[in-house]
Amino acid sequence: MNRKQCLETIQLLARITAADDNGYVQCVSCGVIKHYRDGMQGGHYIPKGSSSYWALEIENVHPQCVGCNIFGMKSGAAAQEYTLWMEDMYGREFVQEMLEKRRNPVKLYKKDYEQMYKEWSELIKYHQNRIGEC
């Protein structure tokens, strides 16, 4: 296991966990509703490339449509809407704490990635069963 595999897994986990029993999930930025496998991504509130601290924390990854995640976070209103959603979900103090800790370095080792991957894969299987995919 490596960082890339864990990033892919946590992004899937974020989408499937938020999905209803039919597999549909809502974009936290624009509100569009789609199947978690159809045009939806696990978007990072704090970009994964700028924070080793938050990159693999589930509180930082939530469902976003492709448009909001790829384009809207850089040049559109998606980032502002994501911030409002985060404050509503976790509270303003937690979001401020996230921003303060975003530059804190975290060193992960292969065993850390293996443990995360194993734990998240089990949760994904649970949710696949919940929505009737297994």
Where are these predicted regions, by residue range?
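Short microdomains enriched in Cys/His and/or Lys/Arg
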Residues: 48-61, 87-100
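Active-site metal-coordination segments of metallo-dependent hydrolases
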Residues: 4, 51-55, 73-75
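Short Cys/His-centered divalent metal-binding micro-motifs
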Residues: 32-35, 60-91
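Histidine-centered nuclease catalytic patch
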Residues: 26-60
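Short, charged surface segments at domain edges that flank catalytic/cofactor-binding sites
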Residues: 1-26
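Short flanking/linker segments adjacent to small metal-binding domains or redox-active Cys/His motifs
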Residues: 97-134
